[in-house]
Amino acid sequence: MKVVSSIGALKYRHPDCQVVKRRGRIYVICKSNPKFKVRQGGAKSKKARR
C-alpha cells in the first residue's frame, strides 16, 4: 500500500482529478478513474462524558 503525505499532490495523478472539501474532510475525486479516490481528515476527538 502506498502512503502519501500530501493529499493536494494527488490532484496531479490524472487530468480529471479534483480536490473537494466537504464536512471538514478533504477528498480527491476522479469520475473517469475511480481508483484515484482519496480522503483525508477522518478522526475527531471525542468529548469526555461525565
Swiss-Prot record:
InterPro entries: Ribosomal_bL36 (IPR000473), Ribosomal_bL36_sp (IPR035977), Ribosomal_L36_bact (IPR047621). GO terms for molecular function: structural constituent of ribosome. SUPFAM superfamilies: Ribosomal protein L36. Keywords: Ribonucleoprotein, Ribosomal protein. The keyword tRNA processing does not apply. Pfam families: Ribosomal_L36. GO terms for cellular component: ribonucleoprotein complex; ribosome. One of its GO terms (biological process) is translation. NCBIfam families: PRK00831.1, rpmJ_bact. HAMAP family: Ribosomal_bL36 (MF_00251). PANTHER family: 50S RIBOSOMAL PROTEIN L36 2, LARGE RIBOSOMAL SUBUNIT PROTEIN BL36B. This is Large ribosomal subunit protein bL36. It comes from Rhodopirellula baltica (strain DSM 10527 / NCIMB 13988 / SH1).
